[in-house]
């Protein structure tokens, strides 16, 4: 699973996901890509599940780039805990994804293989996505 080696602060505010993505919204590395259409937090487990599914489907020859990185810690309190006594401890990491952001990119394979692999990865995502081809 992906996570930062070290961060400046252990805990973060939740923040807001307003507007569309201004960074990472173009295809840079491959020829095909999976683009987010909704804002969401995508966990490191979901990113890894999608990457594994794509790798299994493409086998050799294709190259996959993961364009998002989970750098935001999400804290959870222990169950059945009373209110107060501070913020919970960090449990997992998420990537903040806005609409328009490329999640995965792929190259070195035929379009039909890429479409199939990316659709399998898209089913692992908690948001609506679309398949994009570099023209």
From Swiss-Prot:
Main location: plastid
Subcellular localization: Plastid, Chloroplast
PROSITE patterns (alphabetical): RIBOSOMAL_L16_1, RIBOSOMAL_L16_2
Keywords: Chloroplast, Plastid, Ribonucleoprotein, Ribosomal protein
Keyword Transport among UniProt keywords: no
Any GO BP annotation: mitochondrial translation
InterPro entries xrefs: Ribosomal_uL16 (IPR047873), Ribosomal_uL16_bact-type (IPR000114), Ribosomal_uL16_CS (IPR020798), Ribosomal_uL16_dom (IPR016180), Ribosomal_uL16_sf (IPR036920)
One Gene Ontology MF term: rRNA binding
GO cellular component annotations of the record: chloroplast; mitochondrial large ribosomal subunit
Signal peptide range in chain numbering: none
Family classification: Belongs to the universal ribosomal protein uL16 family.
Quaternary structure and interacting proteins, as annotated: Part of the 50S ribosomal subunit.
NCBIfam families named among the record's database cross-references: rplP_bact
Protein name: Large ribosomal subunit protein uL16c
UniProt source species: Populus trichocarpa
Organism lineage string: Eukaryota, Viridiplantae, Streptophyta, Embryophyta, Tracheophyta
